[in-house]
Amino acid sequence: MEALLGYLLIFVARLTDVSMATIRMIMVVKGKRVIAACIGFVEVSIYVVAIGKVLSGMDNPLNVLAYASGFATGNYVGIFLEEKMALGNIIAQVISDYEVEKLVEKLRNVGFGVTVIEGYGREGIRYILNVSLQRKHLSRLYQTVEEHDKKAFVTVTDARAIRGGYFAGMKK
């Protein structure tokens, strides 16, 4: 029973510290220094406990298996958590040629700020709709665009910072 608890401790510690590492890296990229440092402190403390447990029992391959399994699962869980947290801002480009004025009106009625640029694609004139938004509202953008134009081309890029312009909250 004690050995089983040891494996579980190693697994959970690795799962936790690797998940935290994923979130910490996102905070670093977004310029959130203090949050990243605090997460890093807790993360490395947990890591030291896990590696200490493994190194004290290197003759037991199940310790290594628990460590590796926790690492792999931690990567998965970290990415899952990051997606659910949906931190930060993004810039979406919606390219369409179908009743663009109506699409722009729908997007603005939902609460998005939209800038329209005329472009020329392979098959003629297209309109590029630039939309800056919080990541947590991306599914609402997709839904609104999909309801209007199933063939619209949408690209999304991360925005480290947004300053000025129309950046309102979503309407219910």
From Swiss-Prot:
InterPro entries: DUF2179, DUF5698, N-reg_PII/ATP_PRibTrfase_C, UPF0316
Membrane-traversing stretches: 3-23, 34-54, 61-81
The UniProt record lists the keyword Cell membrane: yes
CC per GO annotation: plasma membrane
Pfam families: DUF2179 (PF10035), DUF5698 (PF18955)
Membrane topology of this protein: Multi-pass membrane protein
Family membership: Belongs to the UPF0316 family.
Listed name of the protein: UPF0316 protein Clos_0555
Native source organism of the sequence: Alkaliphilus oremlandii (strain OhILAs) (Clostridium oremlandii (strain OhILAs))
High-level lineage: Bacteria, Bacillati, Bacillota, Clostridia, Peptostreptococcales
